[in-house]
Amino acid sequence: MSSRSRHDVKGPAGVSAHGPSTRQLRVAEEVRRVLAELFARTEFRDPELLDVRITVTEVRISPDFRHATAFVTRLGRSDVEVLLPALKRVAPFLRTGLSKALNLRTVPEIHFQPDTALDNAMELDEIMRSPEVQRDLNSKPE
């Protein structure tokens, strides 16, 4: 038998092959909650972020807790990609807010990614409602 336990199995980029740990999930949810509060109550000086409603849908934390990837969407619009440079500019400010709100040894560096899950679901719904698919669904098998 190998000297490595089953908990030592690593996948690509050092990520555990068994998924995130319970602590990673817990910290990620706390980071998501604090980021959502900061976006809801903070007036950003960046002109690209004025009067913009941003929703943080998910946060993933790296195994070493040094990096957090926040998946964001823009309320009512799907063009969140244009906001990514502005979000990158305010990331240090948001990290400071995280450090004040969370009791962590290392406050993660925040990286932003657009959350396309809602767009994908809407596109799939549109496809499912198309006449061609409805015809195929309603046809009787031979």
Swiss-Prot record:
Question: What InterPro entries does its record include?
Answer: KH_dom-like_a/b, RbfA, RbfA_dom_sf, Ribosome-bd_factorA_CS
Q: Name a GO molecular-function annotation.
A: ribosomal small subunit binding
Q: Which GO terms describe its cellular component?
A: cytosol
- Subcellular location, record wording: Cytoplasm
Compositional bias, Basic and acidic residues, is annotated for: 1-10
Tell me which Pfam families the record gives. RBFA
Q: Where is this region: Disordered?
A: 1-22
Can you tell me which residues the record assigns to a coiled coil? none
Q: What's an example GO BP annotation here?
A: maturation of SSU-rRNA
Q: Which UniProt keywords apply?
A: Cytoplasm, Ribosome biogenesis
Tell me which PROSITE patterns the record gives. RBFA
Function description: One of several proteins that assist in the late maturation steps of the functional core of the 30S ribosomal subunit. Associates with free 30S ribosomal subunits (but not with 30S subunits that are part of 70S ribosomes or polysomes). Required for efficient processing of 16S rRNA. May interact with the 5'-terminal helix region of 16S rRNA.
NCBIfam families to which the protein is assigned, alphabetical = PRK00521.2-5, rbfA
**Which PANTHER family does this one have?**
RIBOSOME-BINDING FACTOR A, CHLOROPLASTIC-RELATED
As for family, the record states: Belongs to the RbfA family.
Assembly and partners are described as: Monomer. Binds 30S ribosomal subunits, but not 50S ribosomal subunits or 70S ribosomes.
Q: What is this protein called?
A: Ribosome-binding factor A
Q: What is the lineage of its organism?
A: Bacteria, Pseudomonadati, Pseudomonadota, Alphaproteobacteria, Acetobacterales
